[in-house]
């Protein structure tokens, strides 16, 4: 397993958020001014990880064989509590970094679904798919 890093952008929802939770329509796009960057490193400990990254690691290891121990660390300049999807960007960047290190290629849909699983089932965040679809596809989205 090699060391790796990956990024994900925040997003803006122009129309429909949070109606996507209930199957409603939405319109949004990623913001390229900021990003969450996650580093996977085999030389650091896992004990210092924030709960968001611990939950992400757990979801990844449920579906993929983890070859050796590694730690995750992050840098993010996404404004906190601004409604830009910062937590999903951090989860998505971590999943991308783990996939890259383990030779796994995500489809945009599986990446978005795994991110939503981390947030809903492991962290109790109430969310719909729109944020994650925008961030996984990295483009303007009407859904």
What are these regions (language model features)?
Residues 1-88, 96-108, 138-140:
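ATP-binding N-lobe of GHMP and related small-molecule kinases
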Residues 106-143:
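Alpha/beta catalytic cores of group-transfer enzymes, especially the acyltransferase/condensing modules
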């Amino acid at each position: 397993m090699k060391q790796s890093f990956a990024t994900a952008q925040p997003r803006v929802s122009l129309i429909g958020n949070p109606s996507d939770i209930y199957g409603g329509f939405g319109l949004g796009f990623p913001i390229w001014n900021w990003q969450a960057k996650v580093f996977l490193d085999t030389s650091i400990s896992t004990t210092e990880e924030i709960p968001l990254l611990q939950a992400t690691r757990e979801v990844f290891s449920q579906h993929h064989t983890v070859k050796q121990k590694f730690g995750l660390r992050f840098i993010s300049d996404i404004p906190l509590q601004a409604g830009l999807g910062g937590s999903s960007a951090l989860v998505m960047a971590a999943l991308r970094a783990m996939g890259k290190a383990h030779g796994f290629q995500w489809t945009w849909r599986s990446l978005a679904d795994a991110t939503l699983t981390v947030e809903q089932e492991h962290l109790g965040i109430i969310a719909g798919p729109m944020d994650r679809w925008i961030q996984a596809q990295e483009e303007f989205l009407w859904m």
